[in-house]
């Protein structure tokens, strides 16, 4: 099972990470719990059934820790992270606007640090681009209307990962 862990009832109409940046910009945030509750639920199901769970694009400290604990317990779980989720924080939204609107959203520095630690200690199994390009005219819209995703730049991902 490959899972994009997001609880739509919590992320509904959110456009960036819930926190100080969202408050400063007056934007509705997507809470970490939107990801965390789904990771917790699906780890329980995987452990109970013996199914293999692959969690796509982890982005929160708590989700990384839950996967770490699940692996220690013998749960058949793997996960991936994206280059933007271990190199950029939600502060990038203030500078880049809708070009930094993605799902899951860019998270806090604490979350980024946890993702980096997860890569370093082997909790994270692979790095994936989660490539979701959009035309510049679509990303030029306001936050409510601009799609989630990054404009092109697939060719830059390897350079980001290697630095």
List the model feature ranges, each with a label:
Residues 1-127:
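Histidine/acidic residue-rich metal-binding segments in metalloenzymes
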Residues 16-19, 141-146:
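Short, surface-exposed, charged loop/turn segments at secondary-structure junctions
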Residues 35, 145-160:
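Gly/Ser/Thr-rich active-site loops/lids in small-molecule metabolic enzymes
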Residues 43, 159-163:
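Amphipathic alpha-helical segments within well-ordered protein domains
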Residues 93-99, 136-143, 155-159:
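Short acidic (Asp/Glu) and glycine-rich catalytic loops that position anionic groups and cofactors
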Residues 123-137:
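Catalytic adenosine-cofactor/nucleotide-binding cores of aminoacyl-tRNA synthetases and other
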């Amino acid at each position: 099972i490959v899972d994009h862990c997001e609880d739509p009832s919590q992320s509904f109409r959110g456009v960036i990470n819930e926190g100080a940046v969202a408050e400063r910009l007056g934007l509705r945030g997507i809470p970490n719990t939107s990801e965390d509750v789904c990771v917790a639920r699906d780890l329980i199901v995987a452990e109970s059934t013996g199914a293999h769970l692959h969690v796509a694009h982890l982005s929160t400290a708590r989700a990384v820790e839950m996967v770490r604990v699940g692996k220690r317990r013998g749960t058949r779980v793997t996960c991936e992270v994206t280059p933007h989720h271990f190199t950029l924080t939600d502060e990038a939204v203030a500078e880049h606007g809708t070009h930094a609107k993605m799902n899951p959203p860019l998270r806090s520095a604490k979350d980024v640090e946890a993702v980096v630690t997860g890569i370093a200690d082997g909790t994270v199994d692979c790095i994936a681009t989660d490539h979701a390009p959009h035309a510049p005219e679509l990303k030029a819209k306001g936050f409510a209307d601009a799609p989630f995703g990054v404009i092109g730049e697939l060719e830059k991902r390897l350079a980001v990962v290697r630095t």
